[in-house]
């Protein structure tokens, strides 16, 4: 299923900047960045639960926030993009 993950991490402190880097790094491991602090991830249920747990452990819920939008498996008709797209589609294979 496609899961859209967005986050807002308070970066006023060094600890906040560290949390921001950690959240972004985890999201990169599971999907692709489509905008600052916005990732598209193709996940199964187990991966979704695991990533949510990892990210929740990183953030400070007093000053940071996470949002998860579960768009399901039929997401191609639910996503519209306008403008420059600088990457592969989230479901395309990249061979290195």
What are these regions (language model features)?
Residues 6, 11-13, 56, 77, ...:
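Residue-identity detector for threonine
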Residues 35-65, 70-72:
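Short, intrinsically disordered low-complexity segments
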């Amino acid at each position: 299923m496609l899961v859209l993950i967005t986050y807002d991490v308070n970066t006023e402190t060094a600890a906040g900047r560290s949390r921001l880097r950690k959240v972004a790094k985890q999201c990169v491991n599971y999907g692709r960045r489509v905008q600052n602090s916005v990732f598209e991830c193709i996940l199964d249920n187990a991966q979704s639960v695991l990533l949510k747990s990892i990210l929740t452990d990183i953030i400070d819920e007093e000053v940071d926030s996470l949002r998860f939008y579960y768009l399901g498996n039929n997401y191609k008709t639910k996503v519209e993009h306008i403008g420059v797209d600088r990457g592969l589609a989230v479901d395309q294979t990249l061979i290195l």
